[in-house]
């Protein structure tokens, strides 16, 4: 039994699939594909899967990964990719299937590209220029106004 990493991209309407729904999608796709995946032992067996660094709802991705254990000794990774892409929902495409080289918790960082409106740099500069950013904090004792200015990072916008 080996662990296989399935790398996929999530675009357009698929970006609104939450992590729990994505788990259900992957389970259904793997079941329908007929690929030899390993199931947990127990009263209600399910496919063993691990998602590495899942994204928040509404974010598109070019590289998301799910690790799956397989019962096959030497799986044909090209056949896995073809079988999965044939039944994937619109907006999700598997672009690589390979044996696991490093565990999901070994990922140290991720690179994000975020697109903002044209006036975002100006609004961010205005925000950074503020001396204080009052925030209402609710507690058992009531509502009080605090400033977390000393905790915020200095944000910048860069043109790429």
Where are the model-predicted features located?
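Short glycine-/aliphatic-rich beta-strand segments at the starts of folded cytosolic domains
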Residues: 6-8, 110-115
């Amino acid at each position: 039994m080996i662990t296989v990493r399935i790398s996929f991209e999530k675009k357009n309407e698929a970006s609104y699939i939450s992590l729990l729904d994505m788990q259900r999608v992957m389970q259904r796709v793997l079941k329908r594909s007929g690929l030899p995946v390993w199931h947990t032992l127990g009263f209600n067996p399910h496919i063993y899967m691990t998602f590495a660094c899942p994204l928040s709802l509404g974010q598109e991705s070019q590289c998301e990964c799910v690790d799956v254990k397989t019962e096959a000794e030497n799986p044909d990774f090209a056949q896995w990719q073809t079988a999965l892409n044939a039944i994937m929902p619109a907006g999700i495409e598997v672009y690589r299937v390979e044996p696991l080289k490093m565990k999901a918790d070994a990922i140290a960082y991720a690179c994000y590209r975020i697109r903002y409106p044209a006036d975002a740099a100006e609004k961010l500069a205005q925000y950074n220029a503020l001396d204080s950013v009052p925030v209402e904090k609710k507690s058992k004792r009531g509502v009080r106004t605090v400033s977390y200015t000393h905790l915020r990072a200095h944000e910048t916008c860069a043109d790429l």
